[in-house]
Amino acid sequence: MQTCTLAVDIGASSGRHIVGTVQNGKITLQEVYRFENGVHRENGHLCWDIDTLEQEVVNGLKAAHDAGFAPATIGIDTWAVDFVLLDADNKRIGDAVAYRDERTEGIREALEKEYGLTFADHYARTGIQYQPFNTVYQLMALKKEHPEQLAAAKTFLMVPDYLNYLLCGVPANEYTNASTTALVGADSRDWDDALIEKLGLPRGIFQPIKTAGTVLGHLTPEIQKAVGFDAEVILPATHDTGSAFLAVPARDEYAAYLSSGTWSLLGVENAAAITGPDSCAANFTNEGGYEYRYRYLKNIMGLWMIQSVRRELGEKTGTRPSFPELIAAAKEAADFPSCVDPDDNRFLAPASMIEEVRAACADTHQPVPAATGEVMQCVYNSLTQDYRRAVETLQSLTGKTYTSLNIVGGGSQDGYLNQQTANATGLTVFAGPTEGTALGNLMVQFIHSGDFADLAEARAAIRRSFEIKEYQPE
């Protein structure tokens, strides 16, 4: 059996178990298991199938063992903001409602009207941008719809916290994900007790906040028996974007980062939060990062639009087009000029992404895309112009001029998007590594194991180990 570390990286559409090893200062990755993920409608809401996720995590651990690996450590990362509640017997309460559900509509306005909490005040306390699905709005929606669930709750765990708890039996809230609740103080980096009390939420359900690198414990005897080995459960940056930022092989302090996946998150790492009125107006966020740094970034709709178009075309024809086929179609319509605002809530969960893009173009008196290539080119135009605006705003807010954009994650494989991004922003684009999130997850484990002394050494190893493609503006 080969000793290794294991990253369980779960996204909105799929999850992977990726084994990592270090030899002669170089990192090797091997995917040992993959599974599908998604939402379904239950009790009137879009929900995650948490029971299936739990089983798939265990299935992947078995697969690693069956492939001849003996993980010494395991780390789990997922998306942010979503959570589960446990009762006094540690049983789950209610459903794990997904962030794309509509239950939070109107909640932000209700907080101001009923609790006197303006968004400007909220932002000044937490530094977290407005998104309709922020955990605080989900909790307040739950309080309105099912107050009995909050009353019965004894433990609040975000999705990766809960999966970690199932593996080792230790409840904890990890900092990078906890920060996305908009209930953590930007300066204190801890639960904002006054804010929680003001909103009438039960303070006792929130667990002590732990940082990435914390060892929670060993696999429970039941899990050990099921998977065939024991391992330490370590907290990575459990928010997938937090892990992805760790994997950015930035060369200097003038590099901006873009984690490109279902969501595009563009920003930089800061030592202190920026929570002034200009930052609030720009809706930039100060999410928790590794070693209590801040990921100062803009949340952009990202590849969700492309994924939705692809899925929709597959439903219409019976065969999903490949991403290269969609890129080729866009190139054929490269002169199509229209673009929309990817951050408009109309694109969050439309019945038809293609028709929503067309309607948005019509609403703004632009040419309406007809063929698939025109729709795709419109999406590419929209994303890259959003990236350009985000870079310009970032420079204004930080007072820095950035010279490069480092793209990690699945979107870094899209050479057409990378080149269009370089053209739109005027920045040199460095693309890769592709497995940014899983790699960042593993970095924390490698530092814990002593394979690397610190993050700087780990990032240098990433540059040695993976192909990084360069795109110059044209």
Show where each model-derived region lies.
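Active-site core segments that coordinate phosphate-bearing ligands/cofactors
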Residues: 6-7, 19, 112-126, 137-158, ...
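N-terminal glycine/serine-rich phosphate-binding loop of ATP-dependent small-molecule kinases
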Residues: 1-94, 152, 224-233, 425-427, ...
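Glycine-rich beta-strand-to-loop/alpha-helix junction loops that act as flexible
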Residues: 77-80, 212-213, 260-263, 404-412
